[in-house]
Structures are given as C-alpha cells and as structure tokens.
Amino acid sequence: MRHGDISSSKDCVGVAVVNYKMPRLHTRAEVLDNARKIADMIVGMKQGLPGMDLVIFPEYSTHGIMYDAKEMYDTASTIPGDETEIFADACRRAKTWGVFSLTGEQHEDHPNKAPYNTLILMNDKGEIVQKYRKIMPWCPVEGWYPGDCTYVSEGPKGLKISLIICDDGNYPEIWRDCTMRGAELVVRCQGYMYPSKDQQVIVSKAMAWMNNTYVAVANATGFDGVYSYFGHSAIIGFDGRTLGECGEEDYGIQYAELSVSQIRDFRKNAQSQNHLFKLLHRGYTGKINSGEGDQGVAECPYEFYRTWITSPDAAKEQVEAITRKTVGTAECPIEGIPNEETPSGHR
C-alpha cells in the first residue's frame, strides 16, 4: 500500500476519495444537474490521477438532504435510472469504477413506504456491480427504510469490496460481517456532521485494524443550512494507519494505491494480530499445550450474540432493560418520535 504518487499497477488499486460539498437541492432537475457535475469531476480527476481505478463520493452527494418530506419522496430515484446513467457514462469515459450515493432509492411500495438510503458500486463499463441499502439509518433524524444485508463484490483488479453508509460504521458488527465474508476494502460513504468529527475519524481507523481491512471514507463538507459537515475523507491501510486524509476543504481529494497481494499475504501469514483468523481459533496455543488439538475454539463465547440470533425479542428486552423501552425520550422530545409520554404512531 502506497501514498504520494498518482500511479497504480497491476497489483495496486488506485483509490480516490472526495470531500464533496453538501448540496442543498429541492427538485429532480437540480438533482440531475448535480449528478452531471459529479460526472464532470470524475473525468477531470482521471486526467490528474491517471492511476485512479476507483473514485468514491460521500453519502448525500447526489441528492443532498431533503429536509422537506415531499421533496424527499418526489426526488427519490429508481436504480437503474437517470442518475445512474449519468454516472455510467462518466465511468466509461474516465475508464474508472465509482461509488455513488442515491438518497433516496424508491421503495418497492413507493410512495407508501419510505425510500432507502442506497450506495452503488459501478464498474468501468457503467454496470452496477453492488447495490447496498443502509442497514442502520441515523435515527431519530433519518427516515430511511432500513436495509437488511451486506454484500461483497469483486472490484477493480479483483479487490473484494463492501459498501457501508455513515452510521453503519458505528456498529462493529457490520465491519465484521463484511470482512468475514471476504471484503478487503470496506467503503464507508458518509454525510457526517459536527460535533462527532474525532469519534468518526477514530472509528474508521480502529475498524481497519480490528478487521485487517483497507477502509476508504468519503465525507461531505460545508453547511447546508442545518448541519456543518467536517470532511476528513481518508484512505486507511489494513494495519489501521492512515495513508492519506483530507482536511475540511470543499472538493478536497485524497488518493492512495492499495496492494491486493499485501492484504492477502497479511491475512494468510500474520499471527499475533490476525484478528479474523484468531476469532475462530481462540486460544489455540493453550489448546496445543493441553493436548487438545491445534485448532483452538470456534464456538461463539458471547452470550448476547447467541441470544440475538436465537431469540431477537429476548435480546431486545435485554437492551431495553439497560436503556429505555420507547424509541424517543421525553427529556429531549423530537417531533414524530414516540416517547414514554406520547402515544405511538408514525410520522
């Protein structure tokens, strides 16, 4: 894994992340104009970064945040659709892969159900290789319909890629799911705002280390009239060290080369910090010394996870016992979110 050049190689995937300024849009026409702006940026970036194999844009970079519910439903996209065709043309022209945000994607029961918050991974032929729907919408603010699974897809030069979105990344389970299924690069597209800059920078580095994976973060910048976004798009090595990181500048770009062979060699040959292998071979040294074979222990030792899988309702009761039973709290009420002093109901 390398940083500082504009090249790539047969072994190294050139990855760029963009500090895209959060747009404030209201109509479908404005969304499509912004998609064309993103497309033009891709073509220009490839001229400056000839090694670029993959370009990544933040959550909300295509639509912005529609704070008006009617606008959110009216501008929700289909996949494939007009926006994806604009991106497909750009990927073909620039001969690069791309990750793009669609907020939202129409629900199958549109407009009776809330849209999804969706990312797509597109190849250099303009084909959609992965479509991921955000599993953990940023409640209580985000009103997206939740997705229900992660994916792993083969990306440029065979690098295996998973997509996650913003608040997803605050839950260690999603990182483990992606990497245990084979992901070598976890792409975290986010529209993260202050105050949690320090926490979000730390968590992506920590998850890279804990899961022996490359991480690419693309975040928004600017002020959209409601939130201020902190940028700091970054590319992180599988050892948890940052290869390149933007500041807070609008349209800042970072670029690094991710070796396919290095991460595979590490996962095969690393020992004391091979967190993926060791999780399913717990205590193998002690087992060897005890005459109990050389495989360690594979059984899950964590009671909460066993309960969650076998009895989700019991796990929910367990967490409510140490937190609260209602989705909202009366001490800081939010309109449309039921709390212990208000009746249930949807927005």
From Swiss-Prot:
Record EC number: 3.5.1.4
PROSITE patterns to which the protein is assigned, alphabetical: CN_HYDROLASE (PS50263)
Top-rank taxon: Bacteria
Catalytic function, reaction form: a monocarboxylic acid amide + H2O = a monocarboxylate + NH4(+)
Active site: 59, 134, 166
Pfam families hit by this protein: CN_hydrolase
Keyword annotations from UniProtKB, A to Z: Hydrolase
Domain called CN hydrolase: residue spans: 13-260
Database matches in InterPro entries: Aliph_Amidase/BUP, Aliphatic_amidase, C-N_Hydrolase, C-N_Hydrolase_sf
Coiled coil ranges: none
Gene Ontology molecular function: amidase activity
Record function comment: Catalyzes the hydrolysis of short-chain aliphatic amides to their corresponding organic acids with release of ammonia.
Family statement drawn from the similarity comment of this UniProt entry: Belongs to the carbon-nitrogen hydrolase superfamily. Aliphatic amidase family.
Name of this protein: Aliphatic amidase
UniProt organism field: Thioalkalivibrio sulfidiphilus (strain HL-EbGR7)
